Regions:
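Intrinsically disordered, low-complexity regions
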Residues: 1-2, 119
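C-terminal motif of bacterial Sec signal peptides marking the signal peptidase cleavage site
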Residues: 24-25
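N-terminal secretory signal peptides and thylakoid transit peptides that target proteins
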Residues: 2-18
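Bacterial Sec signal peptide processing site at the extreme N-terminus
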Residues: 29-34
Length: 329
């Protein structure tokens, strides 16, 4: 059964119990002595301290795989219930989020466009559009994810090298037997050119080789990540298919029975191997504001907050890999 919202990320509501004990006063009319009064509740040091109202919270956009983080941010920054925050988050996906933010929206707009992006890297054609428009954006890396490859659990192949993956997607390796599997054709799924995962696929794998990439027919290039996962699982009831996604999405947001992740160069993707970058196909994701966002604007406050201890705890709480903090010299 599909699991559109993982229990490990979306249902991590920090349900803090403030047991306020109401003491019934005696009929003597005397006040409680300090010794008789209940001890004051001491907030947990890790409990987020809200600093914006729900109405003040900046409008967000970004990548599909960042939706759980956006919801956790909104809950922590405003104090609203996490489940309620989840229902308020929608995104236009990676490429469109960058285009809309860089080309159309303004930092001083009261009612149009996003004010803050939480997003994966932009496709090259979008970077070119932003450069041509001289878009003034400020961005910083706030976490790390990875490009991962998905196969049917019945496929005996456990690991592929980066070069084997390049050869598969260039059409030079066409049978699983050539990489230690059975004598069956390899059916290699991709994503559309405007997707965040396709951008990482080209940057981290294809462009580090000879750049050769076979064109994928429409039926092998689903429009969304969920469609790709479904297609790999359901393709011809066989173990021939391979595809890719970002680790967080497949691990936390859209898991599906019958699939598993391949190791790459012998390293299995996971939070630990992504954190220390021993898994070879890692990349960062970003927070982005307009460069002219005022210091006291809600979007700038949230952007800066992501660098604080509370902000990093928020990222971790949502299940993402945070970046190591380098001490200042």
């Amino acid at each position: 059964m599909k699991e559109m919202i993982s229990r490990r990320s979306f249902l991590r509501v920090m349900g803090l119990s403030f047991g306020a004990a109401m003491l019934t006063a005696c009929n003597t009319g005397t006040a409680d002595s300090p010794a008789d009064s209940p001890a004051a509740s001491v907030p947990d040091a890790d409990t987020p301290v809200p600093f914006l109202t729900e109405d003040e919270f900046p409008r967000l956009d970004g990548s599909t795989a960042c939706i759980p983080l956006m919801a956790q941010m909104k809950a922590d920054v405003t104090g609203m219930d996490l489940l309620e925050a989840q229902t308020s988050i929608t995104v236009s996906t990676t490429a469109y989020a960058w285009e809309n933010f860089g080309l159309w929206s303004r930092s001083d707009s009261e009612d149009y466009g996003a004010q803050l992006l939480i997003v994966y890297e932009a496709p090259e054609y979008v970077k070119e559009e932003l450069a041509e428009a001289d878009a003034k954006l400020e961005q910083k890396a706030i976490g790390r994810d990875a490009l991962v490859f998905i196969v049917n659990e019945e496929n005996p192949v456990q690991s592929l090298t980066q070069q084997q993956l390049r050869d598969i997607y260039a059409g030079r390796i066409t049978s699983w037997k050539d990489v230690g599997g059975v004598d069956s054709p390899i059916v290699a799924f991709q994503r559309g050119v405007d997707s965040g995962s396709q951008t990482l696929f080209k940057k981290l794998l294809i462009d580090k080789g000879d750049g050769q990439l076979m064109a994928a027919p429409t039926e092998l290039a689903p429009a969304d990540m969920g469609g790709l996962v479904d297609s790999i699982a359901e393709y011809n009831n066989s173990a021939n298919a391979i595809g890719f996604s970002v680790y967080y999405y497949i691990d936390q947001m859209y898991s599906k029975p019958g699939l598993r992740l391949l190791a790459v160069d012998g390293v299995t993707p996971g939070n630990d191997t992504i954190a220390d970058e021993s898994y070879p196909l890692c990349n960062e994701f970003y927070a982005v504001v307009h460069a002219d966002a005022a210091p006291d604007s809600p979007q700038r406050k949230v952007y800066d907050w992501l660098d604080t201890d509370e902000g990093r705890r928020c990222i971790e709480k949502a299940g993402y890999v945070t970046l190591s903090v380098t001490p200042q010299a």
